[in-house]
Regions:
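Enriched for extracellular/lumenal, surface-exposed ectodomains of secreted and cell-surface proteins
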Residues: 23, 28, 174-177, 223, ...
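A recurrent domain-boundary module in secreted/ectodomain proteins
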Residues: 38-49, 246-271
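Extracellular low-complexity, Gly/Ser/Thr-rich intrinsically disordered linkers
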Residues: 211-259
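Activation on beta-sandwich/Ig-like modules and their edge loops
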Residues: 48-218, 222-225, 229, 270-271
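Short, polar/proline-rich extracytoplasmic segments that appear immediately after membrane translocation
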Residues: 2-67, 71
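Alpha-helical architecture
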Residues: 20-23, 28, 187, 243-250
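Residue-level detector of alpha-helix boundary/anchor positions
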Residues: 13-16, 76, 236
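Short hydrophobic/aromatic segments of transmembrane alpha-helices and their interfaces
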Residues: 16-17, 89, 231-234
Length: 271
């Protein structure tokens, strides 16, 4: 009887050990991981998956701001009154004019200045003085005409001191009323000068504008270095003034097939 109890106890011990071992393996066969509010079940011996952070929505993306390219300023624009257009012959030999342009933002009083001329083959300088109230407006014009001038635009100053040669000559704008000499015609009193055509006595800035305008034609100062006859007569530079001055008459002017005189009452033009 005692032997039977011992055998029974041994059997129960083995049964209990087997059950405990089975329970333990079952318990550890699955790994439980709590992530946030969810449970992830993995297989024994494997690493639990790692959660990947979700990108925050609504985070602004930096924008690249482009830097504007500065607008270039046209070069060689005069900062003083210039001779802007010359017609040497209209309906008659003395139907002629000289036009001035003021590219500055202030009126300029010319009452103590003079306009002077020397023919292409001559040795004499001729002078016509400006008078009181000869004021050229800011970005405006002033028109000087011979007594034989008969254009539709009225002159601001009329004279019969000289006649522009149809072959060639030099026009001087001088800031005093002293007649020029060979020694002074390139000096500081000469504000501007323009030589056109041919002649041994031409006194140009740089080179003369070699073409002498024909009847009713004129030579006109450019608005910019890129200006040409088309842009000055019917293109983008028509109303941009006549400020270009590279100190070379040959480069600074274009030939107009039809002259276009402007006076102090004409619309101002800003370069």
């Amino acid at each position: 009887m005692r032997k039977t109890k011992i055998i029974l106890i041994i059997i129960l011990f083995f049964i209990g050990s087997f059950s405990a071992l089975k329970f333990t393996r079952s318990y550890f066969s699955d790994t439980e991981k709590v992530l946030g509010n969810s449970i992830q079940v993995g297989t024994w011996g494997e690493s639990a998956p790692t959660s990947t952070p979700t990108p925050t929505e609504g985070t602004p993306t930096p924008e690249t701001t482009s830097t504007p390219t500065p607008t270039s300023t046209p070069s060689n624009l005069a900062d003083h009154v210039v001779i802007s257009e010359i017609m040497v012959k209209g309906d008659s030999a003395d139907d002629e004019f000289i036009e001035l342009y003021n590219p500055t933002s202030s009126n300029v009083n010319l009452s103590s200045w003079s306009i002077q001329y020397r023919g292409g083959g001559a040795a004499t300088y001729y002078r016509k003085n400006f008078e009181a109230n000869d004021i050229i407006p800011a970005h405006g014009f002033l028109l000087i005409g011979n007594t034989a001038y008969n254009g539709s635009v009225s002159v601001d100053m009329i004279h019969n001191t000289f006649s522009l040669s149809s072959d060639g000559g030099t026009v001087f704008l001088v800031n005093n009323q002293t007649t020029l000499t060979d020694a002074a015609d390139n000096g500081p009193t000469v504000v501007d000068k323009v030589a056109y055509g041919t002649g041994t006595s031409l006194r140009p800035e740089g080179s003369a504008y070699s073409t002498a305008p024909a009847q009713n034609q004129s030579i006109e100062r450019k608005a910019y270095s890129t200006s040409d006859t088309a842009s000055m007569t019917s293109g983008l530079d028509t109303n941009k003034g006549n400020a270009y001055d590279s100190e070379d008459n040959a480069s600074d002017f274009v030939l107009r097939t039809t002259s276009q005189p402007q006076n102090t009452s004409s619309t101002t033009e800003i370069p």
